[in-house]
């Protein structure tokens, strides 16, 4: 059954678990257990905020471990969940980290990046609220350049109307704008505060703000280009930076979602001859422990507590097992969800049902060339059949196999579409077979092509 967008009755605590699952169903096929687990975790966040007294701080999120092969929907579930709630969301592969003391990224950079995302989110939101005022101020600055500050109100009004109508878009003006040229020098970390890096430019900005001034330079540019530069400048002046940072830290601490992929790759498998690698992997796990359990991380915006950030870890666990993770880390990921491998029916649903399904995407792309692209039911079934066959015979990459199959299937149509205006193309099972059967039957070729 096709999931459709639904208008829900207003709930003071946000979406209910069943509503969250319904929303996820619009984009993701199957994996009901995983959807249910994340829906409960999200609702529990809302419940915690309504608990009064000291007990609220004692209620911590139940972090999730998703187990399943690639392409079955692990990342997509977490990503859609964050989008659904407008939560700061950060995805990272566990293999990118090294133990503290080794060359590479340390795990605390996860929180620094999460806060950066939260700050940008809050800043964008604040700028939309002052957009009209910022636009008016930008127009006033451009008018000063066009007709002078001492011009009559009648003249200014006349030129303002021309700016708004776009009549002066290609008129060149000379105007002072903020100098964004980076000052020479790199960035350095503040001793004792890893991650709280400060570049020379940042230091200059801080001094400029303290003195209530900033460096500007005069440039020649078109009115339309000036508007694009000055509106963000004026928005920056109108928003309260300190308030935004506080709101962003609060958002990251209470609503942040961190998705750690490939956590199975840092599990100790106990294989001989890889002692150093085992030590390094175990070191990364130990570094992750305080982060997931709850600690304070210093960032350039201030200290951030991780106690109530929701961590979702995932891995295929083909070689390692969840029990190969450190016992302490296993304990900090109490909810385990196993995602099922995709069946032929799942593949058919993935092609047809989601609001942003691949079939709809390709039809829309080709449609921009005034070519109508349609898929017969027999073609959809054949594509799904081939996807399952290659996944079984070559390597199981789940729904991602559909991308490579469709690219190969529609390669000629995509190339020639611009010369086929006004035509209708129907893809049936015979077309699919003609295009792909040689590749599918030759497994050595399929390994490279599909």
Swiss-Prot record:
Predominant cellular place of this UniProt entry's protein: cytoplasm
A Pfam family reported for this protein in Swiss-Prot or TrEMBL: MCM
Gene3D superfamilies listed in its UniProt record: 1.10.8.60, P-loop containing nucleotide triphosphate hydrolases
CDD domains in the record: RecA-like_HslU
Top-rank taxon: Bacteria
Family (UniProt): Belongs to the ClpX chaperone family. HslU subfamily.
Role of this protein: ATPase subunit of a proteasome-like degradation complex; this subunit has chaperone activity. The binding of ATP and its subsequent hydrolysis by HslU are essential for unfolding of protein substrates subsequently hydrolyzed by HslV. HslU recognizes the N-terminal part of its protein substrates and unfolds these before they are guided to HslV for hydrolysis.
PANTHER family recorded: ATP-DEPENDENT CLP PROTEASE ATP-BINDING SUBUNIT CLPX-LIKE, MITOCHONDRIAL-RELATED, ATP-DEPENDENT PROTEASE ATPASE SUBUNIT HSLU
Subunit comment: A double ring-shaped homohexamer of HslV is capped on each side by a ring-shaped HslU homohexamer. The assembly of the HslU/HslV complex is dependent on binding of ATP.
Official protein name in the record: ATP-dependent protease ATPase subunit HslU
Organism of this sequence: Rickettsia peacockii (strain Rustic)
Gene coding for it: hslU
């Amino acid at each position: 059954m096709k999931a459709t967008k639904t208008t829900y009755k207003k709930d003071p605590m946000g979406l209910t678990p069943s509503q969250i699952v319904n929303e996820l169903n619009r984009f993701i096929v199957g994996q009901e257990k995983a959807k249910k687990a994340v829906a409960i975790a999200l609702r529990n966040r809302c419940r915690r905020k309504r608990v009064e007294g000291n007990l609220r701080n004692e209620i911590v999120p139940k972090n999730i471990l998703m187990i399943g092969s690639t392409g079955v929907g692990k990342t997509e579930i977490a990503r859609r969940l964050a989008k659904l709630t407008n939560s700061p969301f950060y995805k990272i592969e566990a293999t990118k980290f090294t133990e503290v003391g080794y060359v590479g990224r340390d795990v605390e950079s996860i929180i620094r990046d999460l806060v950066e995302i939260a700050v940008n989110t809050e800043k964008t939101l604040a700028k939309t609220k002052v957009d009209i005022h910022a636009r008016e101020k930008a127009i006033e600055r451009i008018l000063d350049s066009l007709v002078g500050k001492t011009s009559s109100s009648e003249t200014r009004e006349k030129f303002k109307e021309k700016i708004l109508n776009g009549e002066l878009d290609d008129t060149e003006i000379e105007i002072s704008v903020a100098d964004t040229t980076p000052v020479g020098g790199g960035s350095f970390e503040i001793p004792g505060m890893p991650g709280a890096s400060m570049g020379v430019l940042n230091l200059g900005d801080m001094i400029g703000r303290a003195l209530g001034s900033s460096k500007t330079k005069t440039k020649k540019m078109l009115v339309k280009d000036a508007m694009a530069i000055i509106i963000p400048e004026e928005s920056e002046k109108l928003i309260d930076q300190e308030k935004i940072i506080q709101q962003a830290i609060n958002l990251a601490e209470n609503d942040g979602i961190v998705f750690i992929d490939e956590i199975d790759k840092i599990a100790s498998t106990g294989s001989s001859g890889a002692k150093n690698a085992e030590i390094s992997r175990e070191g990364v796990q130990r570094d992750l422990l305080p982060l997931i359990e709850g600690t304070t991380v210093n960032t350039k915006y201030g200290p951030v507590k991780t106690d109530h950030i929701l961590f979702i870890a995932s891995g295929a666990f083909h070689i390692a097992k969840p029990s190969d993770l450190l016992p302490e880390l296993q304990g900090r990921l109490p909810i385990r969800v196993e995602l099922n491998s995709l069946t032929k029916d799942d593949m058919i649903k993935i092609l047809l049902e989601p609001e942003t399904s691949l079939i709809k995407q390709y039809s829309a792309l080709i449609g921009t060339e005034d070519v109508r692209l349609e898929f017969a039911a027999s073609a959809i079934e054949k594509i799904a059949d081939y996807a399952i066959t290659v996944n079984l015979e070559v390597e199981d990459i789940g729904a991602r196999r559909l991308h490579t199959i469709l690219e190969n299937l529609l390669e000629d149509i995509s190339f020639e579409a611009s010369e086929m205006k006004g035509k209708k193309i129907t893809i049936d099972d015979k077309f699919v077979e003609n295009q792909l059967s040689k590749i599918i039957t030759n497994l050595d070729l399929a390994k490279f092509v599909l």
